């Protein structure tokens, strides 16, 4: 006589794609629409919109539980500009822990209804470090990684499983804290044919209250001195990149540049864009394109 054993598995689903999984690594692509909360935190990920799970025990005798494990948190790149928080939204009084987690959470979420998809009730928040504004997240960046453990009332009979959920941004995210603002989140500068230039970069900043403001450039660089940003154009010109300069000269990547005291009147960064030789290859014809990030800080 043949018979089948009931399944004690927990099945989860990527709500965006419909992909189902019961363990292992899963990636989520998220269009991030940050919402500033009353406590100045920024809501980044609502897991209830992204992940659902269901109990697969048709007998109703086995409850599954999920808990989030040590090491879960935002990506290291975000940790340098912000700190994070995880909230379980199903708790009446709330349950919050700072990220990255330093220990496995004892709070669990139960899944006991057979065949019923239940959203995972948690949200991830960012708290920008004081003085940080500008672009914080780039399209394609890893936002956060959650390590999740599934266990059951039937113990090992029902199987213990581990998940790794990785969330990637599908858009750029800018933070405007309400204290200082930039004139544009995206500035396109068209250079004339080589060797023409330089061309003014129309970018200003202003603050609600007078602050000491500085900015830092970042992006792929080439050559010595970190002042020539790499040409990222497909089939682009060789031996040449883009350089941003102010009245003091070329601005290196990764080194803060002070704008002094900035108040309610817009202050220009005073930047000009020009071509610059990399010194690493012969000059060859082609397109030139560089993407340069500007991050502001104030105190």
Swiss-Prot record:
Tell me which SUPFAM superfamilies the record gives.
Bacterial adhesins
Subcellular location per UniProt equals:
Fimbrium
Q: Which InterPro entries match?
A: Adhesion_dom_fimbrial, Adhesion_dom_fimbrial_sf, Adhesion_dom_sf, Bact_Fimbrial_Adh_Pro, FimH_man-bd
- The cysteines joined by S-S bonds are none
Taking the first listed entry, what is the main subcellular location of this protein, grouped into a coarse class? other
Q: Which GO terms describe its cellular component?
A: pilus
Recorded hits in Gene3D superfamilies, A to Z, give: Fimbrial-type adhesion domain
Q: Does the keyword Transport apply?
A: no
Q: Name one Pfam family in it.
A: Fimbrial
User: Which keywords appear in this protein's UniProt record, sorted alphabetically?
Assistant: Fimbrium
What GO terms describe the biological role, i.e. biological process, of this protein? cell adhesion involved in single-species biofilm formation
The entry summarizes the disruption phenotype as follows: Deletion decreases hemagglutination and fimbriation levels.
Asked if Metal-binding is a keyword of the record, the answer is no
Q: Which family does it belong to?
A: Belongs to the fimbrial protein family.
Function according to Swiss-Prot or TrEMBL? Fimbriae (also called pili), polar filaments radiating from the surface of the bacterium to a length of 0.5-1.5 micrometers and numbering 100-300 per cell, enable bacteria to colonize the epithelium of specific host organs. A minor fimbrial subunit. This protein is necessary for full expression of S-specific binding. S-fimbrial adhesins enable pathogenic E.coli causing urinary-tract infections or newborn meningitis to attach to glycoproteins terminating with alpha-sialic acid-(2-3)-beta-Gal.
**Protein's recorded name:** S-fimbrial protein subunit SfaH
Q: Which organism is it from?
A: Escherichia coli O6:K15:H31 (strain 536 / UPEC)
């Amino acid at each position: 006589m043949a018979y089948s054993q009931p399944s004690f598995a927990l099945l989860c689903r990527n709500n965006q794609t419909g992909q189902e999984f019961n363990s292992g690594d899963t990636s989520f692509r998220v269009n991030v629409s940050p919402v500033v909360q009353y406590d100045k935190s920024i809501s980044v990920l609502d897991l209830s919109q992204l992940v659902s799970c269901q109990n697969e025990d048709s007998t109703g005798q086995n409850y599954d539980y999920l808990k989030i494990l040590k090491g879960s948190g935002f990506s290291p790149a975000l940790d340098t500009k912000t700190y994070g928080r995880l909230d379980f939204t199903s708790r009446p009084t709330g349950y919050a822990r700072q990220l990255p987690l330093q220990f496995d959470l004892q709070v669990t979420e139960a899944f006991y209804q057979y065949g019923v998809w239940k959203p995972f009730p948690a949200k991830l928040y960012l708290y920008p470090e004081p003085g940080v504004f500008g672009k914080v997240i780039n399209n394609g960046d890893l936002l956060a990684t959650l390590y999740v453990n599934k266990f059951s009332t039937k113990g090992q009979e029902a199987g213990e499983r581990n998940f790794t959920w990785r969330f990637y941004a599908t858009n750029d995210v800018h933070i405007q804290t309400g204290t200082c603002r930039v004139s544009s989140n995206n500035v396109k500068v068209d250079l004339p044919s080589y060797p023409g230039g330089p061309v003014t970069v129309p970018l200003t900043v202003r603050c609600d209250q007078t602050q000491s403001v500085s900015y830092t450039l970042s992006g792929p660089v080439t050559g010595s001195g970190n002042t020539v940003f790499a040409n990222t154009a497909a089939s682009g010109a060789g031996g040449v990149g883009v350089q941003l300069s102010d009245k003091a000269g070329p601005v290196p990547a990764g080194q803060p540049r002070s704008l002094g005291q900035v108040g309610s009147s817009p202050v220009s960064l005073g930047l000009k864009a020009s071509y610059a030789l990399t010194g690493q290859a012969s000059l060859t014809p082609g397109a030139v394109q560089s993407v340069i990030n500007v991050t502001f800080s104030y105190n």
